[in-house]
Amino acid sequence: MANLRIIKRRIRSVRNIAKITRAMEMIAASKMKKAQERGLAGRPYSEKITEVIAALAALPQSGEILHPLLERRPVKKIAILHITPDRGQCGGLVANINRKTGTFIMEQKVPVSAVVVGRKGVDFIRRIRQQMRAEFINLGDKPDYLDTLPISRVIMDDFMSGEIDQVFIAYTQFVSTAIQNPVLEQLLPVMPVELPPGQNLEYIYEPESATVLNSLLPRFVEMSVYHAILESIASEQSARMVAMRNATDNAKELIGELTLVYNKARQESITNELLDIVGGAAALA
């Protein structure tokens, strides 16, 4: 009977856990839809400003000094913007992006400092004893563009002052509900992409193209950081929903297995009691 009570207690515990994971799955699903909409809505703007900067950089300039964010110099120190969630329970997402950043840091032959977004990233950078330039936590599930400006300002100020010579950004790119890819890209100096052959954006710029380019570059960096954070949040909520769904399914499967064990043990207990009764009756006869 003691064994039956233990099994019954385990079934009750697993059932309670299943209720919690189911509730977390539903919450994550609600947040995921909103996060996906915000992340996907920012892609056209990000793509267009990248395209315009590429077109501007390809135009002949009038000799005006270009923005410091375009300056390429010998790399003596690198910074990496490491974007992670504040909370766990989102499958392998945190481990994957931390591994991406950790591998990158180990491969560098020059000092690397980290600007970290999210508690999980802060814990990771501290654990590997890496220099941390700044940390930003508790941005929430719906950060505004203005909320992320201090992050990009730290990076741009350090780069333009010569404190660092190159900046990379590590974040999780949202592909679909089931797929989220860890991505590492160069952020500074800004490297204008090459336009496809024959694609010529014949805009008339007022004032001069160099002035427009210099005005757009800080905005480009700020939007790149903001968009990467939105992508990471969409990925986080998607991964958490899938992880909680899997946890709920596993809990249901475990409940089924424990119920089967409980029924077998109960049947065995009843059989033994019947045998004892029959044996006692036979002894009295």
Swiss-Prot record:
Known role: Produces ATP from ADP in the presence of a proton gradient across the membrane. The gamma chain is believed to be important in regulating ATPase activity and the flow of protons through the CF(0) complex.
Name of this chain's protein: ATP synthase gamma chain
PROSITE patterns xrefs: ATPASE_GAMMA
Alphabetized UniProt keyword annotations: ATP synthesis, Cell membrane, CF(1), Hydrogen ion transport, Ion transport, Membrane, Transport
Gene Ontology terms, MF aspect: ATP binding; proton-transporting ATP synthase activity, rotational mechanism
GO cellular component, one term: plasma membrane
PANTHER family, A to Z: ATP SYNTHASE GAMMA CHAIN, ATP SYNTHASE SUBUNIT GAMMA, MITOCHONDRIAL
Domain of life: Bacteria
GO BP, sorted A to Z: proton motive force-driven plasma membrane ATP synthesis
Complex and partners: F-type ATPases have 2 components, CF(1) - the catalytic core - and CF(0) - the membrane proton channel. CF(1) has five subunits: alpha(3), beta(3), gamma(1), delta(1), epsilon(1). CF(0) has three main subunits: a, b and c.
Gene: atpG
Pfam families on file: ATP-synt
Membrane-topology annotation of the record: Peripheral membrane protein
Organism: Dehalococcoides mccartyi (strain CBDB1)
Upper classification of the organism: Bacteria, Bacillati, Chloroflexota, Dehalococcoidia, Dehalococcoidales
Sequence similarity: Belongs to the ATPase gamma chain family.
Compartment(s): Cell membrane
